[in-house]
Amino acid sequence: MAGAEPDHESRLLPLVGNVYVPRDELFGHLKQSDFLGYTLKALVDGIVPAIRTYVDLSPGEFDSFADILKLYEGGIKLPNIPALEEVRKRFPLQLVKDLIPMGGDFLLKLPKPQIIKADEKAWMTDEEFAREMLAGVNPMMIKRLTEFPPKSTLDPSKYGDHTSTITEAHIGRSLEGLTVEQALADNRLYIVDQHDNLMPFLVDINNLDGSFVYATRTLLFLQGNGTLAPVAIELSSPLIQGDLTTAKSTVYTPQHAGVEGWIWQLAKAYASVNDYGWHQLISHWLNTHAVMEPFVIATNRQLSVTHPVYKLLHPHYRDTMNINARARGLLINAGGVIEMTVFPRKHAMPMSSMVYKNWNFTEQALPDDLIKRGMAVEDPSSPHKVRLLIEDYPYAADGLAVWHAIEQWVTDYLTIYYPNDGVLQGDVELQAWWKEVREVGHGDLKDAAWWPKMHTVAELIKACATIIWTGSALHAAVNFGQYPYSGYHPNKPSASRRPMPSPGSEEYALLERAPEKAFILTITNQFQALVGISLMEILSKHSSDEVYLGQHDTPAWTSDAKAQEAFRRFGARLEGIEKQVVAMNGDPRLKNRTGPAKFPYMLLYPNTSDHTGQAEGLTARGIPNSISI
């Protein structure tokens, strides 16, 4: 599409809006991704205003968990406002028929998320709450606890002492007879620590209308049966003392009856709010979508399409720039859906930008990440050269198998073209590619000591394996479980609105009288929930023509028989992993594979063997080659 100057491109509207995408990065294949763009636009332009009108005309709150379940059983009717009519006129006929039926009110009816399909109350159990830290949608936050009480890394000159207030008295009775020192020594204590991540932003976040968020620490104990149990949750809010932002902290421990049982449910909910926000902004958007862009750009700018590294990486870039452009125009833009629904709101992008300053490419490799978090140790005798300290850690167990398969494929492929380090060092295109990745794509981090020098074949193998892992398996792990786990928002609320009820308060009295209502009034409001859930349903679906890891959409991608054979072996390894995943999910000893919700962990099931679209839709299984949604 040329403008006044034939040598220049103009932007394609309406889908990518004002975010420029190079011509060869636009969706060139007429596939479900095209409908995705229209669907997101329809959500923002039509359905969101209709939801807002519905909430304004109704009481504006869910009354109970049963009231929320009506979303999946009969749906709710949204008013037929002019914005919906405008969407009907502007968008493709088939999409309009499927998404916004002609005439009358628009029925917002959602499929029942997997987390409540088998048991509508399983999400409330401590076991499921903890299991999702190992097999949920954000299973890369948990760390092994190495000191007690947990310490803070916040600058004491600005924040004072933020050492945790959790004591042995809080957790001692929950350690199966061990002392804290013994539990630490035996690798039995773990933590999901959001305190330092969020505390610097909480003053601003809690100054927003209708927002009250805590910085949380969740302490977990590895039980003898291999499952985790939450033993304490610390809720901290900022306390300004002179020039210092100190913390006011309260520790909650498990209770399962009466009003104290509901206080514990709320403590878990506040921790889940932290997890939801971090997942959306950091684990998902930043650490998969955003970080791929410098590699996509440098590869297209510096490597010819016939270069072996281009051929290796290109399938893992498919549609990424385009979907990111749509996200910037519709989702993460100022006032967009993410700011509407996720607790940092207008502070979301500043927060993710701040986190990016500490990003380290070498730590994105799964084994390195697990070792850094203390979840694994190096072990040359183990199949993947690292040994998990929690054996039944589904994300890590499946992830290591997939990582190893990727690494082996990359090794087999690259050693065809780089038999020694000298050949690599003499490859001018490759060296220019890596120079741009480091010095242009990451100009602010170019002097970091951790960057590979790209002097050895081993460095290239690790770098390419990390890029492929990020664009395929890591994104699959954090994306396709969004609706299955968070589509029922009491399980994964995106925001909290008021502090923990204190005895004698009106809120505490409501918690005693109508606990579900009090819980609902504390978490994500109705408007945020309806918009957020509608978005997650769109983003969690596999398309009908998905290309999965170990598959290729261009059979003639290379004429090199050795490369073709190496790729065939890669596919065979992935199909072997599929069988392993199914077998582990059926092993009753591995309790974290399915949990109380009876929802088997399949997010890292490769789905390489599927050539007929069996994983289409909200199946929560399959690893696409690239970030295309």
Regions found by a protein language model. Give the residues of each.
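Long, compositionally biased charged/polar stretches
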Residues: M1-I629
